[in-house]
Amino acid sequence: MANLDMEQHSSENEEIKKKKHKKRARDEAKKLKQPAMEEEPDHEDGDAKENNALIDEEPKKKKKKKNKKRGDTDDGEDEAVAEEEPKKKKKKNKKLQQRGDTNDEEDEVIAEEEEPKKKKKKQRKDTEAKSEEEEVEDKEEEKKLEETSIMTNKTFESLSLSDNTYKSIKEMGFARMTQIQAKAIPPLMMGEDVLGAARTGSGKTLAFLIPAVELLYRVKFTPRNGTGVLVICPTRELAIQSYGVAKELLKYHSQTVGKVIGGEKRKTEAEILAKGVNLLVATPGRLLDHLENTNGFIFKNLKFLVMDEADRILEQNFEEDLKKILNLLPKTRQTSLFSATQSAKVEDLARVSLTSPVYIDVDEGRKEVTNEGLEQGYCVVPSAMRLLFLLTFLKRFQGKKKIMVFFSTCKSTKFHAELFRYIKFDCLEIRGGIDQNKRTPTFLQFIKAETGILLCTNVAARGLDFPHVDWIVQYDPPDNPTDYIHRVGRTARGEGAKGKALLVLTPQELKFIQYLKAAKIPVEEHEFEEKKLLDVKPFVENLISENYALKESAKEAYKTYISGYDSHSMKDVFNVHQLNLTEVATSFGFSDPPKVALKIDRGGYRSKREPVNKFKRGRGGGRPGGKSKFERY
């Protein structure tokens, strides 16, 4: 009982002590509060809060100290006090900093508090600087992209075109100009001569036809004035294509348009010329014929001459014709030369036919000379397996893809087309030696086709625009990298277009890849797997041996293949004396080489070839000792 009374008395004493402590604390608070208000009225709120915080904590500290002595402190209370400490310390340090009486320890605390703010501010500045840098980089990237892309942001509407021309362009589906169009059309419309170079599929045709149509419109050309614009193309198909574009552009104009090309009826063409053709598209040979022999052909008023694919026009069999044509045409005229590549011979022609020309090369400085969307590869196939390789490849994609296959000679193209038809491979062919009334429908048919196989020679390698071609297969390699570029240019045409190209080489021809890479043409090797080839060799050999017409066709193809091989200008790559004739014969369906008269150069390997003299016809391309029809690359 005594103990209980003592404990009760002790607890009462504790309560009394607590009350005394609280009262003392309140009195001290009043004393501290009053002078602060008098001396520093500007900091009234801050000091009051700070002092109140300190006062409120004082009894807790004393209570905590007392409880600690008794050994019954509350852990939760300790945690609460510990959490409140930094907050109060922050407020105190901020206040002391304002008064300027912080000590070193407090300075460190303030520095620690200010550090995150400084970091945030720095991060914000860095972000702003980065944004500006990114914006500059984006603009540079856009400029770079525009320089390397086919398209520009310039519209046809920005040109000072007649309403009728602009209406036609709009109906054709064009809004923005390509690089060559944006750079060539303005000087041409101002009457300047232009030497233009742009990759295939870049819109060269519109680049010269739009100024041509505008010229005829401005000078009010009529049929009785004759021909005011003349466009010369190297091939019939390219002439037909250019004629089609010109016809669309002149749809709402009163001026007339026509074409004269080899293979058509000359008499019919002469009658049309006599009626007056204001814009004439022509191939060199037939044009020269009409210039010299058609009396009703009026060309004395010619204002504008265009030579499209000028480097091809200058090849053998065209040089002399072109020289005569230029001598017959009026000297006072505007002239332009356009091509996918600029050779020394084109520059020579420009010097004698152009006056102070504007030189435009939209591909200058590009890392690659072929189209961006083009995937290019090559496959090394032994000569004896070439035919089986081609059959296997075409069988895989027949009816699924649109494919062009290039051969070195007309006879080789003809034989393969006949063979494929015998074995139920549907295919078309474009080459020399086919009547124009058959060749033109074939050309138009392949344009409209979604899938199909076209076998062709280099006659289809320049300027022709076949939509959506998936594969270019160069079964026979080209003469040089320039021809390679033109061939693969039949696919991946236009902005964003995709396509694939495959070059078939024998092991002896592998050095050609070095020349391609030196010409900035990226090619990847594809693995040749013999086990995947169709096992049809006995069938093909039996078919050819039993079919007289097919056998004769194969003989001619074999013969011209070897003659064509001998005419290659790059003798260090394509040396006819390194051919294994037994393997070559196998690739044409023979078990043994056929007996044919081969006229090839017996002089052996020659590492160098002299270039063809400008404006002089060289000796026959495939004849013994004759120079190549192509200038050495």
From Swiss-Prot:
UniProt catalytic activity: ATP + H2O = ADP + phosphate + H(+)
Binding site for ATP: A198, R199, T200, G201, S202, G203, K204, T205
Family recorded in the similarity comment: Belongs to the DEAD box helicase family. DDX18/HAS1 subfamily.
Top-level taxon of the source organism: Eukaryota
InterPro entries reported in the protein's UniProt record: DDX18/Has1_DEADc, DEAD/DEAH_box_helicase_dom, Helicase_ATP-bd, Helicase_C-like, P-loop_NTPase, RNA-helicase_DEAD-box_CS, RNA_helicase_DEAD_Q_motif, SPB4-like_CTE
GO cellular component terms attached to this protein's record: nucleus
Keywords from the UniProt entry: ATP-binding, Coiled coil, Helicase, Hydrolase, Nucleotide-binding, RNA-binding
Protein name (Swiss-Prot/TrEMBL): DEAD-box ATP-dependent RNA helicase 27
Acidic residues: compositionally biased ranges: 37-47, 74-83, 103-114, 131-140
BP GO terms, sorted: stem cell fate specification
Domain Helicase C-terminal: 386-534
Designated gene of the protein: RH27
Coiled-coil segments on the chain, per record: 2-34, 117-153
Annotated stretches, region: Disordered: 1-147, 608-633
Motif stretch (DEAD box): 308-311
EC number(s) from the headed UniProt entry: 3.6.4.13
CDD domains: DEADc_DDX18 (cd17942), SF2_C_DEAD (cd18787)
Motif Q motif: chain residues: 154-182
